[in-house]
Amino acid sequence: CYYHRNCSVTLMEHIPFDKRSGKIWFNGELVEWQDTKVHVISHGMHYASLVFEGIRIYNKKIFKLEEHTKRLFHSANIMDMNVPYSEDEMNIATRELVENQNIVNGYIRPFIWRGSEMMGVSAQKTKINVAIAIWDWPAYFDPELKKKGIKLNISRWQRPPQNSSPWNSKAAGLYMICTLSKH
């Protein structure tokens, strides 16, 4: 497993994500996967002003799309992001992506982030960007390893207290603990 030496996650065919094909819904337009570009001086990258969801597709059915989209918008609201699309527009775009790319079992990653219009902690003048990417991902855990039992680790890192971060948002910065626990 390329995530961690003791990981039991199934490796989907390992094509680097920047080399994949298909379409990404990017600020209201379908863009070729490899043609999507975000500037390296993006507020979302430097200050973790990005919120996201992770949604599974099982047998061409999207698992709880409306609930995930509602939570995505709730997270964006907590992060003071005025999303330029409605929940309905996002849901329609997601369904169209799944249908057009013929994903049977996969993963949907909608995300919202602040752009590169200004740098610094203050971000009032940044554009709010929105994208939806999907890809094939048949199973999260290797079925054979799953039968034997899945190993879990307890991170030495703890989630920040509720009064120190937007704990009830699915914000990128809150996931550094998950990343660190895999290293």
Feature map (PLM): residue ranges:
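Non-catalytic accessory segments adjacent to catalytic cores
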Residues: 99-103
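Helix-start/capping segments and mature chain N-termini
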Residues: 3-85, 92-96, 121-183
